[in-house]
Structure formats: structure tokens, C-alpha cells
From Swiss-Prot:
Catalyzes the reversible isomerization of glucose-6-phosphate to fructose-6-phosphate. Its main location: cytoplasm. Pathway: Carbohydrate biosynthesis; gluconeogenesis; Carbohydrate degradation; glycolysis; D-glyceraldehyde 3-phosphate and glycerone phosphate from D-glucose: step 2/4. It catalyses: alpha-D-glucose 6-phosphate = beta-D-fructose 6-phosphate. PROSITE patterns: P_GLUCOSE_ISOMERASE_2 (PS00174), P_GLUCOSE_ISOMERASE_3 (PS51463). Gene3D superfamilies: Glucose-6-phosphate isomerase like protein, domain 1. The keyword Metal-binding does not apply. This is Probable glucose-6-phosphate isomerase. It is an enzyme of class 5 (isomerase). One of its GO terms (cellular component) is cytosol. PANTHER family: GLUCOSE-6-PHOSPHATE ISOMERASE. The gene is pgi. Its EC number is 5.3.1.9.
């Protein structure tokens, strides 16, 4: 991953990071790297995510995927990190012949519409819950299982499970002798894309999982004790420094349709990991060039509270723009859609810089397995580094757990929710 933080420095941006402040911050980056390295060496909770390129069993994942490789449709049943990683990998790299869906919400209209539309007899289902107790995942899977039963489909032959050692999902899998992959120990779901949580979906979708993991291993090998020597740390440190100076929003803007879901994955990673103790940078999601026509106005002329992260691949497929008899479009005809999209990228970067909006440019070689594996690993490492600089517990999510527990109690008719003031207008 190659990043350019020049347009985030104070010579261009407001807010911007002074070079001397970046130099001082690099001392903290060195200490943070030592802590991260120690956490990795001890395989500590959370830090173990950065060991996945070494510990993940690609052969076991590939073998599990091969059992349902004949599927025309794949449904991931999970939520949050148990679904976003798979969706990111399949959307970025998956075979176009596979009809892919992530059931990551319990909206009855959506669930029933999906199950009515797909051919369940040629579908594979991957159920993912690290704890095995996730209410939304269990509920959706029970609905899917019932639909397969009603359709006369042997759901046990079409289902793969990833979960922990205990919990209702593990018990169900054991009861019905379902194939089970162990969720990685000590790895929160949002950091588990490069594991049994998401890689099975990628493998079923025809992705070279070995190359994905190799790309992640490249990122692990590139970790170093200075932001000047490590692109992942440079990103995490710059985002942190800008937040400290008022850029409390981080807009992820990929210029590739296949990386649109990556922006969703990034949003969970950044928000759930860093949003604690009254600090954290709020992620926003956009897509270039589409959202130049919806959000760019705000980025350039709205509040000076944003970092814009612009992401693109260095190479793209060819798609020529034909000649036409229309006037005043000579700059288009005979060109290429990729060249047009890259021109939009460059023009947007220049327009943001001209307006003083802090911008970081991120470039990967291509949207291929090795590059995407490196991209995911590097942003995970950037997030861990930022968490060390913020001084937060990067790998927990207590605010989320409160809501989960309250929902369970509400459904069981136990403790009522605390009363809140209402002001209803109809």
C-alpha cells in the first residue's frame, strides 16, 4: 500500500499537521510499535489479529469451501464483522457467476424477499458468529433453515458454520453434524476478515485465498517502528493527528466500484475500535466518482472537520470510449473509462487541496487478491496504531454489548428499558 500524506500537512490543509508535530508523533509511534509487537508476540487478545497471516489454515478453509463449491448462490448469515469482511472480499474479488448475499439484518421484508427469490437447492449458507449467541444471526439462520426445509432441501448438506468453542450455534452444529470452522481465538469480528470468518466465502466465490493471505503477510512484514517506514502506521498516525486538530470525520472515498464495500468494512473497523472515552474519528462512506455529485460540495465548502481518504488501484481493466458524432466531447471519444475515472480522482484531489481540505491518497497496485489482502491488513494495523495513540481499548466494544444485552432482556420480558423523555410529532 502506497500513501501520500502531503495534502494533509499544514502547508496545504486546514486543519493540517505541521511537519515538526509529525516528527514528535513519530516517537510515540515507535513506542506504540513496541507495544503492538509485544502483543503480537504474546498472541494477546486483539493483537492476535495481526498474526492471522501466519496462523490461518488456508488448506482447511479451502477444503470446507470445496464441499459447497457447486453453489450458484452464497448467503453469509452474520452481522457486523461476521458479515462485512466476507462481503468486502466477495464484492472486491468474487466470481461474477456467483450470486452473493449477506443476511446481516433482521428486516423481515428483506429476508423473506431474498428467500423467495433465490434457488435454495443450489445455495450454500455460511453462518458466522464468533460467540455463537448473536441474536440476529441465530434468528436469521433459523428462518433460512426453515425455508430450506419447506423447499425440500437438505440444509445440513448446504450449510457451513464458523463459530467459537461454545454457545448455541456450536451446539446446533454438533447436533446436526455440520461442518464447522473454528473462529480465531482472541480476534474481534471486525479484525477477522483474514480468517475463517470471511475467507470461506471468498474461497466459495473463486478467490485465491492463498494470495489474499500472502498479501496480508506482506503487510505484516512491512510493520516498522517509524511512520516514515510503514505506510499503515503513517495512515493511522496522520488520521489521529488530524483528529486532534479538528478533523473528526474521516471520509473514505474509493475510486473503484469493487472497493465500495471496503468503505463499509472500514467504517465499522474505525468506529467500533476507536470510538471510546469521548474520543474517536467518525467514518463516512462515499464512492468516486459517484459521490462527487452528492458529497463533494460538503467536503469542499462545509465545516472544516473532515479528512478525506482517497483510494484507488494503479491499474484497471480497459474499457474504451467509442467515437461519437456529438459536438464538444472530443476529450472523451477515443479515450478509456479508466482514464476518465483517474482524471476524476486527480481533479478531486486537486480541488480538495485548493480548498485546504486535508486529504490522504492511498494507492494499491490493482484490485486483485494480493493487493486486497495487503489493503485490509494495513488498515487493521493502522487502526491498532491509532488506538495506541488515542489510549483506548481498541479491541472492545462495551457500548455495543449494552445494546445487545438490553435487546435480549426486552425480548425475554425481563428488565424494562430505562425511561427516556419523549416529544412526539405526527
Amino acid at each position: 500500500m502506497r500513501i501520500d500524506i502531503g495534502a494533509a500537512l499544514d502547508a496545504t490543509a486546514t486543519p493540517g499537521v505541521p511537519p515538526d508535530a509529525l516528527d514528535r508523533l513519530d516517537d510515540r509511534v515507535a513506542h506504540a510499535h513496541d507495544r503492538i509487537t509485544a502483543g503480537m508476540d504474546g498472541d494477546e487478545f486483539g493483537y492476535a489479529a495481526l498474526n492471522l497471516p501466519r496462523t490461518v489454515d488456508v488448506d482447511a478453509i479451502t477444503a470446507a469451501a470445496d464441499a459447497v463449491a457447486d453453489a450458484d448462490t452464497l448467503v453469509t448469515v452474520g452481522i457486523g464483522g461476521s458479515a462485512l469482511g466476507a462481503a468486502t472480499l466477495v464484492d472486491a474479488l468474487g466470481d461474477d457467476d456467483l450470486d452473493y448475499h449477506a443476511l446481516d439484518n433482521v428486516d423481515p421484508a428483506h429476508v423473506t424477499r431474498l428467500l423467495d427469490r433465490i434457488d435454495l437447492s443450489t445455495s450454500a449458507v455460511h453462518v458466522v458468529s464468533r460467540s455463537g449467541t448473536t441474536a440476529e444471526t441465530l434468528a436469521n439462520f433459523l428462518v433460512v433453515r426453515d425455508a430450506m426445509d419447506d423447499a425440500g432441501v437438505d440444509w445440513t448438506a448446504r450449510t457451513l458454520v464458523t463459530t467459537g468453542d461454545d454457545g448455541p450455534l456450536r451446539a446446533l452444529a454438533d447436533t446436526h453434524d455440520l461442518p464447522v470452522l473454528d473462529a480465531p481465538r482472541g480476534v474481534p469480528g471486525r479484525f477477522a476478515a483474514l480468517s475463517t470468518v470471511a475467507l470461506p466465502a471468498a474461497a466459495i466465490a473463486g478467490v485465491d485465498v492463498g494470495e489474499l493471505v500472502a498479501g496480508a503477510a506482506d503487510g505484516r512484514a512491512a510493520l516498522a517502528g517509524s511512520l516514515e517506514d510503514c505506510s499503515a502506521y503513517a495512515y493511522g498516525a496522520t488520521a489521529y493527528a488530524l483528529d486532534q486538530r479538528g478533523a473528526g470525520v474521516n471520509a473514505m472515498l474509493p475510486y473503484a466500484e469493487r472497493l465500495e464495500t471496503f468503505a463499509e468494512w472500514f467504517a465499522q473497523l474505525w468506529a467500533e475500535s476507536l470510538g471510546k472515552d469521548g474520543v474517536g474519528q467518525t467514518p463516512a462512506r462515499a464512492l468516486g466518482a459517484t459521490d462527487q455529485h452528492s458529497q463533494l460540495q460538503l467536503y469542499r465548502a462545509g465545516p472544516r472537520d473532515k479528512l478525506v481518504t482517497m483510494l484507488r488501484p494503479a491499474s484497471r481493466p480497459d474499457c474504451a470510449i467509442p467515437e461519437a458524432e456529438l459536438a464538444d466531447i472530443d476529450y472523451l471519444t477515443g479515450g478509456d473509462l479508466g482514464a476518465l475515472l483517474d482524471a476524476e480522482f486527480e481533479a478531486t484531489a486537486a480541488s480538495l487541496a485548493a480548498s485546504g481540505v486535508p486529504t490522504v491518497r492511498v494507492e494499491v497496485p490493482a484490485v486483485d487478491a494480493r493487493s486486497v489482502g495487503r489493503l485490509l491488513f494495513d488498515f487493521e494495523a493502522a487502526c491498532v496504531l491509532a488506538g495506541e495513540l488515542y489510549g483506548v481499548e481498541t479491541f472492545t466494544q462495551p457500548a455495543v454489548e449494552w445494546g445487545k444485552n438490553a435487546a435480549r432482556e426486552l425480548l425475554r420480558g425481563e428488565d424494562p428499558l430505562p425511561e427516556t423523555e419523549t416529544h412526539i410529532v405526527e
